[in-house]
From Swiss-Prot:
Residues 122-129 are annotated as: Capsid binding. Its main location: virion. Keywords: Coiled coil, Disulfide bond, Host cell junction, Virion. This is Virion-associated protein. One of its GO terms (cellular component) is virion component. Signal peptide: none annotated. GO terms for molecular function: DNA binding. Plays a role in virus cell-to-cell and plant-to-plant transmission. Interacts with virion icosahedral capsid and movement protein, thereby facilitating virion cell-to-cell transmission through plasmodesmata opened by viral movement protein. Also interacts with aphid transmission factor, attaching the virion to aphid stylet when the animal feeds on an virus infected plant. Aphid saliva may later detach the virion, inducing release of infectious particles when the animal feeds on a new plant. Belongs to the caulimovirus ORF III family. Homotetramer, through coiled-coil domain. Homotrimer when interacts with icosehadral capsid. Interacts with capsid protein, and with Movement protein. Residues 1-31, 38-59 form a coiled coil. It comes from Cauliflower mosaic virus (strain D/H) (CaMV).
Length: 129
């Protein structure tokens, strides 16, 4: 079991370490404050990357071949536009026997017991609407 003297020594060591770390942190913060802001350095690096990529693209022989091919293409389009627009789907009235429905826009089902909307309550039912 640790006695009070050992505990006091360990606490004093931890306190001295903490003070030295505090001084180190202040020194690091001062060093960072004296340098250029991060945003400016990132913009500089990004500009260099863009310039390098632009130079690589301009110097690439395949790029020159593409530009020559585009320069030699005919001025008129090789594939003409369609003269008539394609007809859309012909969606006529629903002609399949639609028993169980009775909406006029779907056509008549011929079923006398077909449901209609708005719903009409049968005789004897309380009026809900």
């Amino acid at each position: 079991m640790a006695n009070l003297n050992q505990i006091q020594k360990e606490v004093s060591e931890i306190l001295s370490d903490q003070k030295s770390m505090k001084a180190d942190i202040k020194a690091i913060l001062e060093l960072l404050g004296s340098q250029n802001p991060i945003k400016e350095s990132l913009e500089t690096v990004a500009a260099k990357i863009v310039n390098d990529l632009t130079k690589l693209i301009n110097d690439c022989p395949c790029n020159k071949e593409i530009l020559e091919a585009l320069g030699n293409q005919p001025k008129e389009q090789l594939i003409g536009q369609p003269k008539e627009k394609g007809k859309g789907l012909n969606l006529g009235k629903y002609s399949y026997p639609n028993y169980g429905v009775g909406n006029e826009e779907l056509g008549s089902s011929g079923n006398p017991k077909a449901l209609t909307w708005p719903f009409k309550a049968p005789a004897g039912w309380p009026n809900q609407y």
